[in-house]
Amino acid sequence: HPRLGAQAAMLDSRHDAPASQAAVSDPRPVPSPVPIGAQVTQLGIDVVCATVRAARWLVVVLTLATVLHGLGWGAMPRTSWAFLAVGLLVGWTPVGQIGLSVLVSRVCLRGLRPGTYPRAGRVHLSVWGCEKFAESIGATSMMSAPWMLNYARWLGASVGRGVDMHAVPPVTGMLTLGGGAAIEPEVDLSGHWVEGEEFHVGHVRVASHASIGARSILLPGASVGKGAVVSAGSAVHGLVPAGQVWAGSPASPSSARKVVGEWPDHRPVRARWWVAVYAVTGILLSFLPIIGFLPALWLLLRPSRDVDVLGSALPATLALTPLATIVGMLGFALVVLVVVRLCAIGVREGHHAVRSRVGWQIWITERTLDMARTLLFPIYASQLTPWWLRLLGADVGRGVEASTVLLLPCMTKIGDGAFLADDTLVASYDLRGGWMRVGRARVGKRAFLGNSGMAAAGRKVPKDGLVAVLSAAPHKSKSGTSWLGSPPVKLRRIATESVDERTYSPTPILRVYRGLVEVCRLVPVVCSVALGVLVAYAFVALAAFGLPAALLLGGVVVLGAGAIAAVVTSLAKWLIIRRIAVSEHPLWSAFVWLNELSDTFVEMLAGPWFAWAATGSPTITVWLRSLGARIGRGVWCETYWLPEADLVRLADGASVGRGCVVQTHLFHDRVMSLDTVTLGVGATLGPNSVVLPAARIGTGASVGPASLVLRGEDVPDGTRWVGNPIAPWDSDDHA
């Protein structure tokens, strides 16, 4: 029964009452909008976090200015080295960043206990504010990545010896990791989520020698037993017994009693000096963008070399931003290529100690490419992407379309005509018992890997096959088969044989037209760099009134820059793509290319200057409305991933959790199909979930974490559903 309608019919046939309603009915009242007072509090938190971000970058700007003054840039101001040293220590070292985040969390969350609290109440906003502060100070940045175990302990978590932790700990400190546990990248350990008017928060426990797969989520109260394995992309709601393998959303015993690939029966020697190596490497990796951007920085600084008044150099500096942007992107791309290629030397399939040269190289590769797909976003989902992936070392066939894929290049093979959608994960490493396992992953010819889909080490997406949105490639599969969900189940699908010029066989002139549009993706990057120049000049101007004024008013500058970025992005959307309607468009069409151009403004301009920091805040809904979304009063929205905002309706009091995608388009056989998505009054879409086009979540209905609402499904009013794909959820289980 793969669809809600079929499930409902089956349930109705077994019971006299309408079981599709009764089995999952939720007696709680329809949630009200987030109160105005709470929204005002959030705006205050936004100002504090903006001031913190501004203070960090103010220190960088004044440090550069002081150095340049000593090198002969007479117009540059000088600042006390004592002030700069303290600022750099607090704002730009892992000890300072993590230490300050821990201090704020410990003070604000003192006395917090597991339980259910009001949405947007004191407890909820305290947790949300601490998370926003941690992001603002850089405690969760690349620089701090190797310090996550220390971060967890300082927050109050119980962490045993020999733990490998490649994810961010919860600011609540409600975490227990037994000795030898392994946490893979992008695991959600937050231990909280919003449902209707309730905020659930609880302790998360991972016993000794257990492992949690990438992109999994552990809900409040989740407990993973000793030696248990939770497969990638799973959602743990309760207890996973010791020694068992569980998979899926919600997680359940896996049919694969034995995980693919034998693991060593002993732990590797864990040389302590590798801890220092990883710590230093994290700092060095955070400087890769700066190293790549150095030639561009030199270009931007040239006009201010011989001026008497720094402000007089601003017009010439802004005029150089297009050239500097191109030079900077090329420089960073070259740095990424060199790092990734060097780190591929000696990497072979099999098991490697986490604390070893090969393990270190694999970790560097994935972290670097994760950073690259953010900073080099314009080259993804373009005609350049296959060439870029080949340069990185992946085996990529002809006619491949790839978006923001994260992969281990030396272990990846992508066949001719394959399609990899947004945020796909290919050949990522596995962790267990101090070991890191890597293996080859393959995406077959004309295969499709959907949004946030995963093809793990040793797996493949079959030729002419499909792995759907938020789904994992199976252990074994035959050509032409399609798979949905976690764990994956076979999906009936009728594939088209179309190979016309608008799908698989574009004419040369279509390639030229698309290339011309893709060149325009540099425009939002230029705008972002120009905005950075303006902010830097504003910081220098503020510093002339004294450091206290600069520190206090810097947040106003950052908020102003964010407002400009948001407005320019909205204007660009309406100029480029205008209002989007329910429709279909082939891949090789102007609509698809222009839609990607508009999205580049979102990711490269609005994202870093506004949207990343605004998620959950009332300001994010104001901006999304300006993009065309219909959003009611008091909506709690922790995502900006509404790809075609015109097609989204979020009614009063609805909640959209962190990491969610309100997916209003799908590519089926290289044809983009767009339709509406609606969340009714007080409806909930839990964290890390995806809702597909033409779907509706009814009034007061709740879809739990890590769930997939399929295309065209209508979740009944006042009911609870969860899973990938969704199924009825016991109304007594509010974990």
What do the predicted segments below correspond to?
Residues 1-24:
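Phosphopantetheine-dependent thiolation modules in NRPS/PKS and related acyl-activating systems
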Residues 15-16, 22, 29, 162, ...:
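Positively charged, low-complexity intrinsically disordered regions
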Residues 19-156, 242-393, 479-628, 716-735:
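Terminal amphipathic alpha-helical/low-complexity segments used for targeting or macromolecular assembly
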Residues 152-154, 158-253, 389-390, 395-489, ...:
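Structural signal for interior beta-strand "rungs" in well-ordered beta-sheet cores
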